[in-house]
Each structure stands twice: as C-alpha cells, then as structure tokens.
Curated annotation (Swiss-Prot):
Cellular component aspect of the GO annotation: host cell nucleus; virion component
Subcellular location: Virion; Host nucleus
Record-stated family: Belongs to the influenza viruses PB2 family.
InterPro entries found in the cross-reference section: Flu_PB2_2nd, Flu_PB2_6th, Flu_PB2_C, Flu_PB2_CAP-bd, Flu_PB2_middle, Flu_PB2_N, INV_PB2, PB2_helical
Subunit structure: Influenza RNA polymerase is composed of three subunits: PB1, PB2 and PA. Interacts (via N-terminus) with PB1 (via C-terminus). Interacts with nucleoprotein NP (via N-terminus).
This protein's name: Polymerase basic protein 2
Disulfide bond sites: none
Organism whose genome encodes this protein: Influenza A virus (strain A/Gull/Minnesota/945/1980 H13N6)
Predominant cellular place of this UniProt entry's protein: virion
Alphabetical GO biological process terms: 7-methylguanosine mRNA capping; cap snatching; DNA-templated transcription; symbiont-mediated suppression of host gene expression; symbiont-mediated suppression of host mRNA transcription via inhibition of RNA polymerase II activity; viral RNA genome replication
Keyword terms, alphabetized: Cap snatching, Eukaryotic host gene expression shutoff by virus, Eukaryotic host transcription shutoff by virus, Host gene expression shutoff by virus, Host nucleus, Host-virus interaction, Inhibition of host RNA polymerase II by virus, mRNA capping, mRNA processing, Viral transcription, Virion
Site note Avian adaptation, residues: E627
C-alpha cells in the first residue's frame, strides 16, 4: 500500500509524467539490446509500426514499370522516394494486393507434382470422416511413429543421391544410384519436373518428404499408421478423443501392413518345413510385395514386428535389442541376471526344465493393447504396474508377467499335462508351454497368486483375482495405473544370430525371438503379395496347389524330362512336390506312389520311350515315400473343393484335362500352360504308354496292312488287330483289348512279349 501511495504522489507531479511520456530513451544498454545484430528483437512490434507507415515495403526499381502508380481506387501504390541506403523503391502493402490480382501468372502445372504430399493430405482430409468427441482419460504411450504419409522408403543417403540427380543434375559429386527404387523414382521425377520454374531448393525439400520416412517418438492412444498421426492434434487431447476415419490410404502404411502379413505367412510356413531357415530365406528372396522384392523392403523398412524381425535376422540385418515374450516387447531397463537350468515340478507333478534368470531386473513390457513395468528377482515377481485399454488386455499382460517371473506358485498352478506343440508338431519349450496353458485358463493362477492390502497411491488402484478393480486389496505385487508405459525409444540396432529353427539370439546368447512369438492373427494384405516359392502355393488353398504344381512341371518340362529318365529319385524328392502331398488322402499316399513309380519304371524299360501327358499327370503322386504293393488304380483321388476328386490314370477328367488339338492343359478349369510335345513323339513307334490296353500277338502279319504310327493306333476299335512300328524299327502285331485291363499287366506282358516277338 505504501508503495502505491508513493507512486500516486509521484504521478501527480507534472514533471514525472513528462519524463515518462516525452523524454527519449537513451540508455545505452537498451539501445544496444534493440539495435545489435540482424535478428529482430521484437518482431510483433516492428510489424505493427511498419504497417502503420505508408510505404513499409521496399522493392526493386523494375517494379515501377510493372505496377501502375495508382490502383483503380486511386490509391498510391509506390512512392518516388528511394529507400534510404539502397537503390530500391518504397512500396505500399496495396501494391501486393494489386500484384496478386493483376500481376503476371505462371504455369501451375508443376505445383501438384512438387507439393504432392500436401495435395494428397488435403484430399485425405476432405474425404476423411470426423466422428463424435468423447471425454475420457487418455492412456497415451510414446511410440516411434511415421509422421510423413506417402513416402517411399529410401535411406537418407539414397534419397540425397536421387534429389541431387533430379534437382541439380549438373552439380559435381559422385552419385551412385543402385537400388531399383532409386532408379525408378529418378526417372519418374525427371520426367515430371521438366521445365519446372519452382525454386530448386523448394523442390529438393519436397522430394525429401516424398522419399524418406520421418519418425518421431510421440504420445499416442489409438492408430499409429501415418494417416492417423498426421491428424494426431485433431483426434486426441489429454482428456478427449475424436473419432476419425482417414479419407484415403498411403502406400507406406500399406507396405508396412503387407510386409507384416507376408513375413508372418512365411515364418509360419517355414516352421513346418524340413529346414526352416533355408526355406525362410528362399521364400523371402522369391516374394514380391506390391511389385517390389521383399528383401529390398526388409533392408529399408524399419517396421519392428516379430515375424519381420525374424526375416531380417535371417538376412543378416541388425534388429532391435529388445526381446519378445507372449506378444509383449520386453526391454530391460536395469539390473542383470545369469541363466541357470533348473528342474521344477508342476501341480500335476510333471517335470519341466526351465532356464532360470537369477538376479534383480527391471523391464518395460509393451504390447498392442497394454503396457507394464515389471520388477523381478530370481523366480519372484516384486512389482508389476499395468495399464491397458480394457480388462481383457490387462489380464493378458498380467498372465505374461506372472509366467515370465517363473514363480513357484505359478508353476504349481498348472492343472493337467502340458503338451502344446507348434505347427510342425514339435513340443514347445517349457516357458511357452506354461504361457499357452495359462492363456487358455488363468483362473487357478490368479486364485493361487495371493492378495495383499494396498496403500492409497495417486493414479494407482488394485486388481482382484477375478480381474475387477479394487481400491483396498490387490493381487500380490500387482497394481493398475492410469498412465501408460512408453515404448522403448531408442532406434539402436544390434547384430544377432539365427539358428535353423529360426530362434534369434543376441551376441550374449539370449533368445530375442522365436517362431512361437509370431502372431496367428490373419489379415488381408493391402498390396498384392506374390509368393513365387512353391512353399507358399497352399496359402490360397488346395486348388492353387494343384494348378501351381502342374504349371511348374510344364514350365520346367525340359529339365524334368531328362531327370525322369536318368535320375528319377532326385526328381521325386523335389520340394515343389511337397505341397501336393497334402491333397492326397493320407492312407493312399504310399500306395499311389508305389503304383506310379512302378508304372514309370516300366515306361523306362520298354525301349526308353514314354507318354508326356501321362507322366506330367502322375508325376506329383510319385513324390511320397512309396509302399511296395501290387495295388492297381484306374483313378487317383485328390482332396480339393471340400471333397475327393478323381484324376483318371488314362484319359481326361475335370481335374486334369489335356486338349490334344490345342496342346493346352487345364487343371480344374484353369489354364495350366501348353505342352510342346517332342516332334518325333507323334510318329515314333509304339511306346509302352500306348501298348497299355493292347495285347501283343506276335511278329508282324502282312494281312493286317502296313505298320501304323502311334497316332493312327488310337483309332482302332476294341478287338481290332494291326501291325505297329515300335521304337527300334521293328514291327509287331497287336490287338486292342476288349476290356480295360489292369495297366500294369499290360506293360509287364508287353515288355516280355515284345522281346519274344522280336527275337
């Protein structure tokens, strides 16, 4: 009060008022502050007083020829006075308005091309749908997200080379454009930007946006793909969220999504093959996603997902050092442990050998729908703080943490035997056995865990064994928090090794990933995934396997033909026949195989000639391990379209139909390719394939006319006789059988009788 009174007294004196309002500020420090350096110290004030002047802008003298002195309203646009200290003219803000309305226009053709990312963003927002705003507590966790929709996935260095080549093609400096994507983009952009008048630097900035993935570590609740991140400020606040559906998709999100689906399919398929690692690599190298080789995408794309990381590890690429268990990403934040094998007894008195982590450790656990902080000692959970979207997600996190803790009460909670197997029918390791068991039913686990009274801590509540929240009691060591746990922010990548069963280890030997961790979620890929590997034929069902198998035989017929006659065993063991076996009824596989192999052997025996179409048709059946039996078949069954369909050993069927006239094969009505038969095959002597169904009567008999060729022979009526030229230029007399006999006896007797007839 005293001070205010004093001030009032001072202000009542006219001298005080005069000093404060009239005198100039000549304090050196203040003058220095506002005049040193080029940087404007008070831009807002500067702008205000500049705009209050009549001519606040300076322009090149040429402007006087380009702009009239006065506008339509008669207002002056520029002053004849020169700008002090330069030879520029003083110009009014009205001149800018005049220029914008009446000034020269330039072609706008390049704007949508250069500012592509912005134009596309506007379109997405125009077609997007904003829903209602909900007020609720937002559990946000920081995740590394892509903030730049619509980009290619070039590394900074690759992009730099492309930009230099497109924008400054004449600059010196070595630029090596090696990758397919670099070359395609460069060509495309050079064409698009011919005669572009936009400042090169601007073009370069915009190209960078299009070529490089930019990521930020941002707090997110909800969608993490780039088309959601670009509207993050509109869709979630501290206590509210607004529903939003993007008005378009962008290729980079589609690539990420399709890559995950392809990787999961490949890992799942590799797991069940004889050599998982070799199969996985073969599939990664022969798969394309949206027309780009999967291995190229893996090298450039930073997506971290279990299956994707297994594929990267197999290719020798570095991956994140965090490990995966139960679908959660674990990152150790402090402590250390040594690992020791220990035998434990389950509640069912089954012995399990587990690798115990001895020592105190702290981890963050991050999943899709829940996150947690875990503190544990040797086989003991000390504390678990969980936050999640809903009860179910929180329960999932608790189960994973309880199993990971390796506590005795968890192992004793097992009821019944643990015998979970993976896709290849191999038993899972003990930790995954326990995990699967409790994921199926965790009632006993929660019941036996124990509960404790809790202190009232801000933002934390308890959770009971039936997964209901509670403020008084909670499962021992476990609390629910409103706050999420941030994802591990570092982008550090480490060198890893992978064994043939696709287990990925860091350099200390800790398992980071294994196929058990790959999600079973099925999705539909946004981009076309083309699996060229035969191992992936079955992904589109049995029909695809059938068609692909026959297409493969026809495409590679030249090679197969030679192998068929010279080293059949190698041919039968080809992996391309593996998928086909799943179509053949289990009980019949061995018998069919034995039958077809014997048949083929007889074809080889009879003067080394054969029937192309029949070999192609029956070849896939010979791949199974054969059973020795005298069984004869006139048709072989394959399981497609939900039932058994028959392939006739002789002749066409809906499954396998060869059109002699067009030489085209259709499998289940789908074209499987055309056969270029050997030119001499039609006119050659009889081959064993045709002798089936004919009885050899003896040496040539002139009464039955000149010797027929193979094609003419097929026109005989049942019971009719004819002379036939066989392979080595010999002629024998045959009769077409009156009934369809067993094929094998024909071939066997034919072989013997030809020898007799000739000798």
């Amino acid at each position: 009060m005293e001070r205010i009174k004093e001030l009032r007294d001072l202000m009542s004196q006219s001298r005080t008022r005069e000093i404060l309002t009239k005198t100039t500020v000549d304090h050196m420090a203040i003058i220095k502050k506002y005049t040193s350096g080029r940087q404007e110290k008070n831009p807002a004030l500067r702008m205000k007083w500049m705009m209050a002047m009549k001519y606040p802008i300076t322009a090149d003298k040429r402007i006087m020829e380009m702009i009239p002195e006065r506008n339509e309203q008669g207002q002056t646009l520029w002053s004849k006075t020169n700008d002090a200290g330069s030879d520029r003219v003083m110009v009014s803000p009205l001149a800018v308005t005049w220029w914008n309305r009446n000034g020269p226009t330039t072609s706008t053709a390049h704007y949508p091309k250069v500012y592509k990312t912005y134009f596309e963003k506007v379109e997405r927002l125009k077609h997007g749908t904003f829903g209602p705003v909900h007020f609720r507590n937002q559990v946000k966790i920081r995740r590394r997200v892509d903030i730049n929709p619509g980009h290619a996935d070039l590394s900074a260095k690759e992009a730099q080379d492309v930009i230099m080549e497109v924008v400054f093609p004449n600059e010196v400096g070595a630029r090596i454009l090696t990758s397919e994507s670099q070359l395609t983009i460069t060509k495309e952009k050079k064409e698009e930007l011919q005669n572009c008048k936009i400042a090169p630097l601007m073009v370069a900035y915009m190209l960078e946006r299009e070529l490089v993935r930019k990521t930020r570590f941002l707090p997110v609740a909800g969608g993490t793909s780039s088309v959601y991140i670009e509207v993050l400020h509109l869709t979630q606040g501290t206590c509210w969220e607004q529903m939003y559906t993007p008005g378009g998709e962008v290729r980079n999100d589609d690539v990420d999504q399709s890559l995950i689906i392809a990787a999961r399919n490949i890992v799942r398929r590799a797991t069940v093959s004889a050599d998982p690692l070799a199969s996985l690599l073969e599939m990664c190298h022969s798969t394309q996603i949206g027309g780009i080789r999967m291995v190229d995408i893996l090298r450039q794309n930073p997506t971290e997902e279990q299956a994707v990381d297994i594929c990267k590890a197999a290719m020798g690429l570095r991956i994140s050092s965090s490990f995966s268990f139960g679908g959660f990403t674990f990152k150790r934040t402090s402590g250390s442990s040594i690992k020791r094998e220990e035998e434990v007894l389950t509640g069912n008195l089954q012995t399990l050998k587990i690798r115990v982590h001895e020592g105190y450790e702290e981890f963050t656990m991050v999943g899709r729908r829940a996150t947690a902080i875990l503190r544990k000692a040797t086989r003991r959970l000390i504390q678990l703080i969980v936050s999640g979207r809903d009860e179910q997600s929180i329960a999932e996190a608790i189960i994973v943490a309880m199993v990971f803790s390796q506590e005795d009460c968890m192992i004793k909670a097992v009821r019944g035997d643990l015998n979970f197997v993976n896709r290849a029918n191999q038993r899972l390791n003990p930790m995954h056995q326990l995990l699967r068991h409790f994921q199926k039913d965790a009632k006993v686990l929660f019941q036996n865990w124990g509960i404790e009274p809790i202190d009232n801590v801000m933002g934390m509540i308890g959770i009971l064994p039936d997964m209901t929240p509670n403020t008084e009691m909670s499962l021992r060591g476990i609390r629910i928090s409103k706050m999420g746990v941030d994802e591990y922010s570092s982008t550090e990548r480490v060198v890893v090794s992978i064994d043939r069963f696709l287990r990925v280890r860091d350099q200390r030997g800790n398992v980071l990933l294994s196929p058990e961790e790959v999600s079973e979620t099925q999705g539909t890929e946004k981009l076309t995934i083309t699996y060229s590997s035969s191992m992936m034929w079955e992904i589109n069902g049995p029909e695809s396997v059938l068609v692909n198998t026959y297409q493969w035989i026809i495409r590679n017929w030249e090679m197969i033909k030679i192998q068929w006659s010279q080293e059949p065993t190698m041919l039968y063991n080809k992996m391309e026949f593996e998928p086909f076996q799943s179509l053949v009824p289990k009980a019949a596989r061995g018998q069919y195989s034995g039958f077809v192999r014997t048949l083929f052997q007889q074809m080889r025996d009879v003067l080394g000639t054969f029937d192309t179409v029949q070999i192609i048709k029956l070849l896939p059946f010979a791949a199974a391990p054969p059973e020795q039996s005298r069984m004869q078949f006139s048709s072989l069954t394959v399981n497609v379209r939900g039932s058994g369909m028959r392939i006739l050993v002789r002749g066409n069927s809906p499954v396998f139909n060869y059109n002699k006239a067009t030489k085209r094969l259709t499998v289940l009505g789908k074209d499987a390719g055309s056969l270029t038969e050997d030119p001499d095959e039609g006119t050659a002597g009889v081959e064993s394939a045709v002798l089936r169904g004919f009885l050899i009567l003896g040496k040539e008999d002139k009464r039955y006319g000149p010797a027929l060729s193979i094609n003419e022979l097929s026109n005989l009526a049942k019971g009719e006789k004819a002379n036939v030229l066989i392979g080595q230029g010999d002629v024998v007399l045959v009769m077409k059988r009156k009934r369809d006999s067993s094929i094998l006896t024909d071939s066997q007797t034919a072989t013997k009788r030809i020898r007799m007839a000739i000798n």
